[in-house]
Amino acid sequence: MTTDTKDFDQLLGKLQKQHEKANLDIYIPTLQDISPSKKITVEQQTQLLTGALTQETRKNVFSYNRVITEIILKNCSNPEEINLVDKIPVALQYRVDTIGDTITVNDVTLDISNQVNNVFPNIEQKIQHVIDTHQFETDTGITITYSTPPLYIDYAVNSDAEKKWSDMQGEDIISELFKVEISKYIQQVSFDSDAISLMELDFNSRMKVCDALPMSCTKHLVDFIEQVKDIENQYVSLSGQVIPMDATLFGA
């Protein structure tokens, strides 16, 4: 028995709708609330593996990072409310749902089923601090307003950077990556009676603003970003091992 093209397309549409009926409850730490999410599909898992392969073989430092972020934003019901610092805990919950509760790292089997819930109480205050809005004023009269960005800002900036620099080798892009990273955190730059909102700027304009900032601004932002990295490190630390956040998280 064969299925003609029209029937197949109809059946495929029904299959996709059937998949979308099965929601997954994802805990979003910055919201301290549950967000309904679509489950990861085989196609999306393949995209994760392909993204990691592209990152490795073509030295494209953005590829895998972009794919996992894209999946989170597409699958979660409230993408505009998800913060960058939510990315790792959301990814861990997707991994538990798709592959299972355990992952083997350096021949050690880790149970990650409750990792997010176990870690959160220890870092709750740190999370609140990094998602709050802060200001820093330099001795030259420039004030930067900054915070950990929404995930969609991280995605947009990384996507633009990938288009611009995907062919550059890793060692040639380090200085540019530094500006890309700090630009995500800056909301506004103020001086005299003027203000520049980075949230409204295109990629190239963001980079130009970062180039014009005094060194004291960048050092202050780096110290703040290190606090975000510390939170991320605690999410992936378990029993003396580091839970991988590359494609191996979803590969086995």
Spell out what each predicted region is:
Residues 1-252:
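Long C-terminal interaction/binding lobes of large macromolecular proteins
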